[in-house]
Amino acid sequence: MLVTVAVIALVLSSLAVGALAAHWPFWHRAWQWQSAAGQWPAQLSGPTQVLSPSATPLPLRLVADSRLAPRAGDALTQLLLVGDASGWAAYWSAPSADVHAPIDGRGLSSALLAPLFGALQHTMTRAVLDEPVRMLLDEWREDARGEITPRQLLWEMSGLAEGEFVPFNPFSWRAQLASGPDFSRAALHAPLAWPPGSHFEPSPANAQVLSLVAGALDGKGFANALQRNLWGRMAGQEALALLDHPRGSIAAHCCMRAAPLDWLRLGLLIANDGVIGRERLLPEGHVALMTVASPVHPAYGLGYSLAGTQAAPVLLAVTPGRRLAISPRERRAVLWVGEGHAPEWLDELLLRGIFGTPDNSSGG
């Protein structure tokens, strides 16, 4: 009898060890999320995929601007960059920060999606924002979630549940979306909490589903869509996108590591109506479309929060420790990197009457 019990115990312990080893990337990331205590981990471990920069990136003349020091010289701010579509970027940095050193964009990663869909639309004759995703996602072809459209996903009106985040629950789609082992499968398991298009509720699944749709539109997957249509046409440095497993799917909802200057370039592309030099990346009118409030949330547009006024809207991408503000009217963007909440005065830097052109600049 004791021998039987011992054998059963040995088998069960072996199975437990095997399961732990097989899902080690999940448990490793889950521990990092848990240790962050509701904040953002300093860096998530695991495999990554390189996104290559453009041979002709959005040009910027970079200058360290002493006018920013009195504003930014607090204990919470690490980097502050102000960019103008005319081609200059003023910055202030704490001694430990570098405008060229990649940072985890955290939730800024999802800010790539609205301009990416514009870039994809620019290559197509049919309108893609209002096409039900069932046309492109076989998994939802016969599912009620197949009625969701990319526009609703960008508006955070898909109806998909936000989900409770319990990092150590390996059976939770929400935990799997954060830690793997399959980001896309996890997003496709997000349940409907509301009829599509009826309710505003941010869900991390929205970004990941959008990545699947973008990949299907491109025909070669999300990584190729992002590389070929957006990042590889504007960025000055490599970026590292987090993968769920080796040679797996990119996390569209978080965690891409890129240089602060390239996050600013994203803002300036939008601020300049989707144009780099003489090349149009986004269709005419797409940026204006991004500034239109959703039917149920007046402070949320296409993939971005909205501030400012109807005549002079400001697009915002806000995530813990990161804030990207974009003014299409002023043709400016401001990136803040720090700890805690961003300062209230940041958007003043978008206004030419308050913050003018730097006197000296150098290539950056």
Which residues does each predicted region cover?
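Active-site Gly/Thr loop motif
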Residues: 237-240, 288-335, 343
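Active-site-proximal alpha-helical segments within enzyme catalytic domains
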Residues: 156, 206-213, 252-276, 321-339
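N-terminal leader/targeting segments and the immediately adjacent pre-domain N-terminus
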Residues: 1-98, 106, 121-128, 155, ...
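Non-transmembrane alpha-helical segments in soluble domains
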Residues: 118, 134, 151-154, 184, ...
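Active-site SXXK
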Residues: 103-129, 153, 210-214, 266, ...
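Short, charged, amphipathic alpha-helices and their helix-cap/turn boundaries
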Residues: 87-92, 134, 169-196, 220-240
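Active-site helix/loop module of the DD-peptidase/beta-lactamase fold
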Residues: 123-161, 189, 216-254, 258
